[in-house]
Amino acid sequence: MIRVLLAEDQAMVRGALSALLNLESDIEVLGSAPDGEAAWRDIQKHKPDVLVTDIEMPGLTGLELAQRIQRHELPIKVIIVTTFARPGFLRRALDAGVGGYLLKDAPAENLAEALRTVHRGGRAIDPQLALEAWSEADPLNDRERQVLRLAGEGQSASDIATQLNLSHGTVRNYLSEAIGKLGTANRIEAYRLARQKGWL
């Protein structure tokens, strides 16, 4: 029996996933969480074999949950089910140890089969997304990504410098590097492009 925990912030999707998986004779849904923090508590309580999670949720994101599971060396496999068909998200998910990455518009039977594959130690990745992920690498380094994310959220260079304990000039350099690497005219365009690609 594969013991599964669901993490999904949309109640209707959460209910549909639970109902779908409960139809399978070899899968048991232990519970479902509406956000990342609740999912982390449920992980510690239920100790599932597999976590099926959305990527964007309040509290902790699905990626942050996967990273936390990896950091704590928990024997839990992770499958992300999302609407985000962005190669950058897939690359970050794989870096976080995720075993499966499926799009919500995939056929329903794909989820149960992916669960079995990932539970056995395999990978279940949307094939088209995998091709795109390998063809276009994220040009930003961690610090450029961090500074660009904060700038895109509306923070000034001075605010970012204070928050990250950097000089104002260093923040401006990181922003200039990110803008140059992405081939955009300004930080807003750079932020939008990086979000669109899934690099932020």
Predicted segments, located by residue:
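Conserved acidic carboxylate
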Residues: 8-10
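Active-site residues of response regulator receiver
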Residues: 54, 82
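Short, flexible helix-to-coil linker/hinge segments that flank and couple to helix-turn-helix
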Residues: 88-145
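Two-component signal transduction core modules
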Residues: 51, 78, 101-102
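Acidic, metal-coordinating helix/loop segments flanking the phosphotransfer/catalytic sites
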Residues: 32-50
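Short amphipathic alpha-helix used as the core "switch/output" element in two-component signaling
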Residues: 41, 63-75
